[in-house]
A protein has these predicted regions:
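PLP-dependent aminotransferase-like
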Residues: 1-84, 91
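Active-site region of PLP-dependent enzymes
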Residues: 87-93, 100-177
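Short, hinge-like loop/turn segments at secondary-structure boundaries
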Residues: 44-46, 72, 96-100, 123
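Hydrophobic/aromatic ligand-binding patch that stacks against planar heteroaromatic rings
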Residues: 17-19, 72, 96, 113, ...
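A generic hydrophobic-helix recognition signal that picks specific residues
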Residues: 51, 75-77, 95, 120, ...
Length: 177
């Protein structure tokens, strides 16, 4: 309540929806007209005492300047949640998108560059405790079978979607090139 998350004004509705779903308010920053990605120069001026996180949106297979964005996040002690739905397989300075911030979010909707046959997605984190919490929440809040310690969700990828992605994933690099 009262928390703000800075994100890009040019994205699918799901970006702002995810922010609102946790009770925060999306604060929109315009795009850089040269890249159509979040204008890094505008982020710092949008930060207020209520700002808790940045949510950059990597679009068109192009990554946001994560060096500059992460420096801003570090300066202001902000969390970073990367929206990688439109840039699976993209890299910034040799590092894959989704591996810079606290969380990376990916979509496998059929229209994405790594699309399944239906809906699906993944979240990544380099923080072991956070990754474990995400895994538990994805299976109804269960850290082990039939033990529910939190109110979770049914966010498991079904076998058919996984099979489609298993066939497509080795081809992703070639498709990107």
């Amino acid at each position: 309540a009262g928390d703000e998350v800075i994100t890009c004004s040019f994205s699918f509705f799901a970006t702002a929806e995810a922010i609102s779903a946790v009770g925060a308010t999306p604060v929109f920053v315009d795009v850089d007209p040269a890249t159509y990605l979040i204008d890094i120069d505008q982020i710092e001026t949008a930060i207020t005492p209520a700002t808790k996180a940045l949510m950059p949106v990597h679009l068109f297979g192009r990554p946001v300047d994560m060096s500059r964005l992460m420096a801003i996040a570090e300066t202001h002690n902000l969390k970073v949640v990367e929206d990688c739905a439109q840039a699976t397989g993209a890299h910034w300075n040799g590092q894959p998108v989704g591996s810079f911030g606290d969380v990376g979010c990916f979509s496998f909707f059929p229209t994405k560059n790594l699309g399944a046959a239906g809906d699906g997605g993944a979240a990544t984190s380099n923080d072991d405790a956070l990754a474990q919490t995400m895994r538990e929440l994805a299976v109804h809040g269960m850290p082990k079978r039939y033990l529910h310690t939190a109110l979770g969700y049914n966010s498991r990828l079904d076998a058919i979607q996984a099979a489609v992605l298993n066939v497509k994933l080795p081809k992703l690099k070639g498709w990107i090139e």
